[in-house]
Amino acid sequence: MKIIPSIASASQLDLKCQLDRIRDVPYIHIDVEDGNFLPNITFGMKTVKEMAAYSKAELDVHLLTTNPIKYIQELSKSGISAVCGHMEALPYPLEFLHEVRQAGMKAGLALNLSMPIEQVMSYIGSFDYLLLMTSEPDGCSQRFRSCALERIRRARACIPDEVIIYADGGIGRDELGKVAEAGADCVVMGRAVWGAEDPAKAWKEMETLNGYGTDSKAFRNI
């Protein structure tokens, strides 16, 4: 199981400095929030492009926006590896998935806790990964919800093995074992990484804990 730091949880005062702190981490997760789908605003396309140009890591983008499809071309030009959009914001999911793949990126669907797993079943074969929120992405406490574990189990049982399952939201060290056992391939971690004095060291400790990170799926291996 791979541990992927979320740059949105780092200090935003000097992103270059924050990227330097995790320069040896091979994967970074970028949340793009537009202030409409969620009340919070994170990164614009210019900032994403600059981060992609500066970092040597493989970057995936999680679009928490009301119109995910409009970002695809700019993200592709920035060298992003993978993009997912929320089912709640996609009136035509196949159009989104097709455009992401046509742009040369891995395509994903994201689900909030309230969205049934069954909503993605008819799109199997059209997406490369599924991101399951494990907290409410409301910008408040973002506490891990234990009910998400059963959702991960159900998704893993229903979805082909080649589809990567992401778990994202409120996950700390105490939840890692449970999330791994439920069947997640990748875990997005924010405060658990960036709240440490040395984020890279914290990432490495969690990546190697009980073998996490060993024989894990990665986008370059799909």
Features from the language model and the residues they span:
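Conserved, mostly hydrophobic/aromatic
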Residues: 15, 31, 75, 130, ...
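Catalytic cores of alpha/beta
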Residues: 17-20, 67-77, 114-125, 171-187
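Glycine/Thr-rich beta-alpha phosphate-binding loop at enzyme active sites
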Residues: 34-42, 46, 113, 121-153, ...
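Alpha-helix-loop-beta-strand connector modules within alpha/beta enzyme cores
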Residues: 41-61, 99-112, 148-166, 205-215
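Glycine-rich phosphate-binding active-site loops on the catalytic face of alpha/beta enzymes
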Residues: 83-91, 131-142, 182-203
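C-terminal helical cap(s) of enzyme catalytic domains, especially alpha/beta-barrels
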Residues: 100, 180, 194-222
